C-alpha cells in the first residue's frame, strides 16, 4: 500500500502527494487517520475517493465525510481498491452510510463479511432480459393509466412539496408487503427526518426484515451524496446476480445525485455546461442507470423520485433522466391545489406497459377512454371559464360531469398518510380499478354526487359515502 501526504484542503476536496510515482488509480479509496476532538472516538478515519491525477505525483480527491480536523502534512494510505460495501443477507434490516458502515444502533457487522466494489461494469448485452409482467401497486391512477413493469425503471417526477416522498413511501408499503421480496432503499440527499420516519415505520410494519437501507442525506458533503446511490445499487446487484432474486430498488432522490455531481464538478474545476450542470451529466446518469437493469438470472425494479426544479421539465437534470425510464408518474401542483391526492397528472404520466398486448384489451380500452374524457374536459375548461357551463352542448355537459367524477375517483387515501388525513388507506387490485372506471364511464354512477368520489379506494366506498350523504344508490 503506497502512502502520501495531504498538501491542500479546500472544503470537501483534498489534494494528496505520493512519492516515487506510486499514484493510486482513479476511483481508488484513500484513508486518513487522525486524532479527533470527540471523546467517544479519539481517532477519526476519513475516506477520500481519487477523482483526478494532476501531475507531479499529486491526486485530487473528494472526501466522503466532513474534512474538519484534516491538516496539511497528514499521512494518507491508498487502500488499493475502490470503496467496498457489505453485501448479502447480512445487510437486510440494517441501515448503512455511503461507506457501508452501519448507522443504526444495532451491533456492528462482523469484519469478515463479503464486500463488493461500488464501481462496477453494467451487465453485458447478452445478459439482459426484458419482461412484460405488470407490477401491481394498489394505487388506482398508477395501475390504470401508467402501469409499472416488473424489472422496469419508473420515475416519479414533481416539484417541491407535491408528494413524491409520500408516494414512494406508499409504494414501499404496498409493494414490499404484497410482493414480499427484497427491497433496497437509497436516500440520496433528502431530509434526514423523512429517512428516520421511514425506518421506524418499516420497523413497526415488519417490512424492515427484508429491506436494506442506505443514506447519504442533505447534511452530508457532496462526495457522499454522489456515491450513496452506487452503494444502494451494489447491494441490490448482489441479490440479483448471486442470490437470483427479484429486487425492488427505491431511490429518493435522483435529482440530488445530479446536484451532488454538479457540486463536485465545480470543486474539481471543470467548465460548467447548460444551466450550470456538470459537462459529464449524461455520462454519470448513464453509468448509474445502465446498472439498474434486469438480467436472465434476476431482476431489479427501480422506483426513483425525481425532483423537478421550479416545475420545469426541460431542466437538464430531469430531461436526462427521462431517456432511461419505462414509466413516468408526473405529479402536478395544480392537482394539489384542488386537493386531489396523489396529485398524479393522468394525461402527462406515461408507461411502455400500457398496450393491449401487456395489460389486455379491456384495461387498455378503459384507460384510453379515461384519457380521452379528461383531455376533452381540459379542452372545455377555457370555454367554461369564459362562458360558463350553460353554453355547452348536452353531450359536453355530460362529458364534464363524468370527467370530474373520474378525476376525483383517481384520488385515494394512503396508508402512510393516515396520521395526517385521519382516514384509512386503501389498496385497490387492478381488476377492481378497471371495473370501477368501466362502470363510471358507462354512466352507471352519474346520479352520485361528485364529492362521494373524493379520496376513496374501491367503488363500493363511493356508494357507502353517497348513502351517508342521503343519496339513494
Swiss-Prot record:
Catalytic activity: ATP + H2O + 4 H(+)(in) = ADP + phosphate + 5 H(+)(out)
Membrane topology of this protein: Peripheral membrane protein
Enzyme Commission code(s) on record: 7.1.2.2
GO MF annotations, alphabetized: ATP binding; ATP hydrolysis activity; proton-transporting ATP synthase activity, rotational mechanism
Residue positions binding ATP: 158-165
Domain of life: Bacteria
Keyword Hydrolase: no
Alphabetical list of PROSITE patterns matching this protein: ATPASE_ALPHA_BETA (PS00152)
TM spans (from-to): none
Membrane is among the record's keywords: yes
Known role: Produces ATP from ADP in the presence of a proton gradient across the membrane. The catalytic sites are hosted primarily by the beta subunits.
Subunit structure: F-type ATPases have 2 components, CF(1) - the catalytic core - and CF(0) - the membrane proton channel. CF(1) has five subunits: alpha(3), beta(3), gamma(1), delta(1), epsilon(1). CF(0) has three main subunits: a(1), b(2) and c(9-12). The alpha and beta chains form an alternating ring which encloses part of the gamma chain. CF(1) is attached to CF(0) by a central stalk formed by the gamma and epsilon chains, while a peripheral stalk is formed by the delta and b chains.
Annotated protein name in UniProt: ATP synthase subunit beta 2
Organism name: Listeria welshimeri serovar 6b (strain ATCC 35897 / DSM 20650 / CCUG 15529 / CIP 8149 / NCTC 11857 / SLCC 5334 / V8)
Phylogenetic placement of the source organism: Bacteria, Bacillati, Bacillota, Bacilli, Bacillales
Amino acid at each position: 500500500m503506497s502512502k502520501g501526504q495531504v498538501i491542500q484542503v479546500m472544503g470537501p476536496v483534498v489534494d494528496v502527494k505520493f512519492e516515487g510515482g506510486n499514484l493510486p488509480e482513479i476511483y481508488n479509496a484513500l484513508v486518513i487517520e487522525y486524532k479527533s476532538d470527540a471523546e467517544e472516538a479519539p481517532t477519526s478515519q476519513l475516506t477520500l475517493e481519487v477523482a483526478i491525477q494532476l501531475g507531479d505525483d499529486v491526486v485530487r480527491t473528494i472526501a466522503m465525510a466532513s474534512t474538519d480536523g484534516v491538516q496539511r502534512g497528514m499521512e494518507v494510505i491508498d487502500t488499493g481498491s475502490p470503496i467496498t460495501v457489505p453485501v448479502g443477507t447480512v445487510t437486510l434490516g440494517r441501515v448503512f452510510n455511503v461507506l457501508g458502515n452501519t448507522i443504526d444502533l444495532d451491533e456492528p457487522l462482523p469484519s469478515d463479511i463479503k464486500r463488493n466494489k461500488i464501481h462496477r461494469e453494467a451487465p453485458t448485452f447478452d445478459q439482459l432480459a426484458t419482461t412484460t409482467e405488470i407490477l401491481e401497486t394498489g394505487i388506482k391512477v398508477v395501475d390504470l393509466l401508467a402501469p409499472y413493469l416488473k424489472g422496469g425503471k419508473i420515475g416519479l417526477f414533481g416539484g417541491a412539496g407535491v408528494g413524491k416522498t409520500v408516494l414512494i413511501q406508499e409504494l414501499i408499503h404496498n409493494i414490499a408487503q404484497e410482493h414480499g421480496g427484497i427491497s433496497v432503499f437509497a436516500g440520496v440527499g433528502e431530509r434526514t427526518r423523512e429517512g428516520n420516519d421511514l425506518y421506524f415505520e418499516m420497523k413497526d410494519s415488519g417490512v424492515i426484515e427484508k429491506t436494506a437501507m442506505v443514506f447519504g442525506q442533505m447534511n452530508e458533503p457532496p462526495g457522499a451524496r454522489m456515491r450513496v446511490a452506487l452503494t444502494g445499487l451494489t447491494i441490490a446487484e448482489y441479490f440479483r446476480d448471486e442470490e437470483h432474486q427479484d429486487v425492488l430498488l427505491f431511490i429518493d432522490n435522483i435529482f440530488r445525485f445530479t446536484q451532488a455531481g454538479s457540486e463536485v464538478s465545480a470543486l474539481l474545476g471543470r467548465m460548467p455546461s447548460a444551466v450550470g450542470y456538470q459537462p459529464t451529466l449524461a455520462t454519470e446518469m448513464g453509468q448509474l442507470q445502465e446498472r439498474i437493469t434486469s438480467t436472465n438470472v434476476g431482476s431489479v425494479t427501480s422506483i426513483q423520485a425525481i425532483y423537478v426544479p421550479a416545475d420545469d421539465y426541460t431542466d437538464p437534470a430531469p430531461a436526462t433522466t427521462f431517456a432511461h425510464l419505462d414509466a413516468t408518474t408526473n405529479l402536478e401542483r395544480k392537482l394539489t391545489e384542488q386537493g386531489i391526492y396523489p396529485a398524479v397528472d393522468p394525461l402527462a404520466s406515461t408507461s411502455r406497459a400500457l398496450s393491449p398486448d401487456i395489460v389486455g384489451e379491456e384495461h387498455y380500452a378503459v384507460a384510453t377512454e379515461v384519457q380521452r374524457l379528461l383531455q376533452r374536459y381540459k379542452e372545455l375548461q377555457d370555454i367554461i371559464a369564459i362562458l360558463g357551463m350553460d353554453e355547452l352542448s348536452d353531450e359536453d355537459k355530460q362529458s364534464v360531469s363524468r370527467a370530474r367524477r373520474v378525476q376525483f375517483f383517481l384520488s385515494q387515501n394512503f396508508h402512510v398518510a393516515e396520521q395526517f388525513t385521519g382516514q384509512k388507506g386503501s389498496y385497490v387490485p387492478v381488476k377492481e380499478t378497471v371495473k370501477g372506471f368501466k362502470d363510471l364511464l358507462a354512466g352507471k354512477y352519474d346520479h352520485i354526487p361528485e364529492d362521494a368520489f373524493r379520496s376513496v379506494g374501491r367503488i363500493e366506498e363511493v356508494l357507502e359515502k353517497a348513502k351517508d350523504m342521503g343519496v339513494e344508490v
